[in-house]
From Swiss-Prot:
Annotated Basic residues bias: 60-73, 82-91, 147-156
One of the record's GO cellular component terms: nucleolus
Organism annotation: Meyerozyma guilliermondii (strain ATCC 6260 / CBS 566 / DSM 6381 / JCM 1539 / NBRC 10279 / NRRL Y-324)
Pfam families recorded: RRT14
Function text: Involved in ribosome biogenesis, probably through modulation of rDNA transcription.
Region of interest (Disordered), residue spans: 34-91, 145-191
Protein name, per record: Regulator of rDNA transcription 14
Length: 191
C-alpha cells in the first residue's frame, strides 16, 4: 500500500496496531511502536524535506507585500477621514462662535465653490437644447445597435439553415428520409 505522506502512513499504522492489540499479544504490538515516529516528528520531517522554489518564495513575498500595502492604504484613508472630520468639526464650532480664521474661511469658501460647481453641472442638463441633443444621440446609438443585432440574427439564422440542409445538425421533429409526423399515407396517394 502506498501512502501520500509519512504522517498518513504513521496514522494508518497506529490505527492498525490499536485494532490488533486485542487479538495479537502486546509484545508484538510494542515492537511495531518502537519503529514508528510520533506525528510531530513526521510533520517536522515533511517540512524539512519540502523546500520552496524561488517562484513560490517570490509569489508569497509579493502577496505579503500587496497585503501590507492594502493595509497601509486603508489606514491612511481612515486617518484622512478622521482628520477631515475633525477639521470640519473645528470649522463648524468656530463658525458658530464667529471665530473663523482667514485660512478656515478660505477653506470653507473652497468647499462651497466645489459643491456649487457640482450642483451647477447637474443642473446644466436641464437646458432644453442640450437635453434634446442628448436624446437624439441616444436614439442614434440605439438604432445602430438594433441594426447590428438584426444583422447578427439574420446571419445566425442563415448559418443554422445551411447546417440543417447539410445535415450537420438535427432539428427536433424532422426525421431524415421519412414523412413528417402526423401525415397520413392517404394524403400522398391523392397527389
Amino acid at each position: 500500500m502506498s501512502f501520500s505522506s509519512q504522517s498518513s502512513k504513521s496514522s494508518a499504522e497506529s490505527t492498525l496496531q490499536k485494532f490488533l492489540s486485542g487479538i495479537v499479544p502486546v509484545e508484538a504490538v510494542q515492537a511495531g511502536k518502537a519503529r514508528s515516529q510520533s506525528k510531530a516528528q513526521s510533520v517536522n520531517n515533511q517540512l524539512k524535506t519540502r523546500a520552496l522554489s524561488a517562484d513560490e518564495v517570490r509569489r508569497l513575498q509579493k502577496k505579503a507585500k500587496l497585503k501590507q500595502q492594502r493595509k497601509l492604504k486603508k489606514q491612511q484613508e481612515e486617518a484622512k477621514k478622521v482628520n477631515k472630520l475633525a477639521k470640519h468639526q473645528i470649522i463648524k464650532s468656530h463658525k458658530e462662535n464667529n471665530e473663523l480664521t482667514v485660512e478656515e474661511e478660505k477653506y470653507l469658501n473652497k468647499i462651497v465653490k466645489r459643491n456649487a460647481n457640482s450642483l451647477s453641472r447637474l443642473s446644466e442638463i436641464e437646458d432644453y437644447e442640450l437635453k434634446s441633443e442628448l436624446e437624439s444621440l441616444q436614439e442614434e446609438i440605439l438604432a445602430a445597435q438594433r441594426k447590428s443585432n438584426k444583422k447578427t440574427k439574420q446571419k445566425s439564422k442563415k448559418d443554422f439553415n445551411e447546417k440543417l440542409k447539410r445535415g450537420k445538425i438535427s432539428y427536433p421533429g424532422l426525421t431524415p428520409g421519412l414523412a413528417p409526423v402526423g401525415l397520413d399515407d392517404d394524403d400522398e396517394d391523392s397527389d
